[in-house]
Swiss-Prot record:
Entry keyword annotation includes NADP: yes
Binding positions for FAD per the UniProt entry: D32, Q40, Y45, V85, F120, D287, T327
Protein name (database record): Ferredoxin--NADP reductase
PANTHER family, per database record: THIOREDOXIN REDUCTASE 1-RELATED-RELATED (PTHR48105)
Assigned EC number: 1.18.1.2
Entry keywords, A to Z: FAD, Flavoprotein, NADP, Oxidoreductase
Family: Belongs to the ferredoxin--NADP reductase type 2 family.
InterPro entries: FAD/NAD-bd_sf, FAD/NAD-binding_dom, Fd--NADP_Rdtase_type_2, Ferredoxin-NADP_redctase_2
This protein's record includes keyword Transcription: no
Cofactor descriptive note: Binds 1 FAD per subunit.
GO molecular function per UniProt: ferredoxin-NADP+ reductase activity; flavin adenine dinucleotide binding; NADP binding
Cofactor: FAD
Length: 339
């Protein structure tokens, strides 16, 4: 297989890259280790609302991915899912051979690393027998809010994810218990105020300072969560249908460290103006990219994608881009109608 650009990572920024490259008449193959496109947006919080995407006062993560894929579809990007990039070999001075864990080989003229935070796994609480309950009544992400309709939920954690999902699930749950080691929650003040209002209304109960201690149930279905007070060691038993532990994610850049590119604190160092890495024709965008003043926002990743694609065009064609506004770029026929 042969293409212009291989994009490593099928998160929102990686998918948008296929659109932006297509606008410059460059083809893309997108490779991702997950079994569906969307990165963390679909794997961890598909129904979580996002508020900082231009033109959308609010949009769920899943809907954003669907819209981005539809936007890119006229340019027919090729997705290689459930595959991890294992090797990047120089074919010659102007191309690479990218090899995946499935044995797929793609020849390309440039590579864009849009790997987000790398390969991620949720931090599992050290509870005996928790594996028996995982994906049955213990979950580390929420795929369908409706699954929690009229259920009793224990949410553990004190960061943004725990607080945000408490607010969202309180709209459908029968009762939510929020377990945290400290009295203060590490979330934005607006969300903290919402938690206080929900607690005063009786919709949720903030149980602090406590930590998870034991699980009880049968055949993977929870019946109760036992918690322990941090200071007094007192134990409490909370009847529950579901446990949602939100203790963050452990990140691993995987094989990126062996690709002969400069790294800094598990991030890929790039030139801010072009998003070039230390290796010719390899670029990095989105959360994985590092430069002075970097903002880890989806919006910023979209801008980086655009800058990288424009620079790749100049490198591949040895000439500047004949700039066109998208309003004057007509895409018809086989590539569908964007207008």
């Amino acid at each position: 297989m042969e293409t212009d650009i291989v994009v490593i990572g099928a998160g929102p920024v990686g998918i948008f890259t296929a659109f932006q490259a297509g606008m410059l008449d460059m083809r893309c193959h997108i490779i991702d280790v997950l079994d569906q496109a969307g990165g963390q947006c679909t794997a961890l919080y598909p129904e979580k609302p996002i508020y900082d995407i231009p033109g959308y006062p609010v949009i769920t993560a899943q809907k954003l991915i669907e819209q981005l894929m539809e936007q890119a579809s006229p340019f027919e990007p090729v997705y290689h899912l459930s595959q991890r990039v294992e090797e990047i070999a120089n074919n010659d001075s102007q191309s690479f051979i990218v090899v995946t864990s499935a044995g797929t080989k793609v020849k390309c003229k440039a590579i864009i690393i849009a790997a987000g935070n790398g390969i991620f796994e949720p931090n599992r609480p050290p509870l005996s027998g928790i594996l028996e309950y995982e994906n049955k009544s213990v979950f580390y992400n929420v795929n369908k809010i409706s699954d929690f309709q009229d259920k009793i939920i224990v949410i553990a954690g004190g960061g943004d994810s725990a607080a945000d999902w408490t607010v969202e699930l309180s709209k459908v749950a029968k009762k939510i218990y929020v377990i945290h080691r400290r009295k203060e929650f590490r979330c934005v003040s607006e969300t903290r105020n919402k938690l206080k209002l929900l607690e005063s209304s009786g919709r949720i109960e903030l149980v602090v300072p406590y930590q998870l201690h034991k699980l009880t149930g049968n055949d993977g279905q929870l019946s109760a969560v036992i918690i322990k007070n941090i200071t007094s060691k007192e134990e409490k038993k909370i009847s529950a249908d579901f446990l949602l532990p939100f203790f963050g994610l452990s990140m691993d850049l995987g094989p990126i460290g062996s690709w002969d590119i400069q790294l800094e604190r598990s991030r890929v160092v790039v030139d801010q103006a072009t998003l070039r890495t230390s290796r010719d024709r390899i670029y990095a965008i989105g959360d994985v990219a590092a430069y002075l003043g970097k903002l880890k926002l989806i919006l910023n990743g979209f801008a980086e994608s655009t800058m990288a694609c424009y620079d790749i065009y100049k490198v591949i064609h040895n000439s500047p881009v004949n700039f066109q506004y998208s309003t004057s770029k007509v895409v018809r026929g086989k590539k569908s109608d964007l207008l």
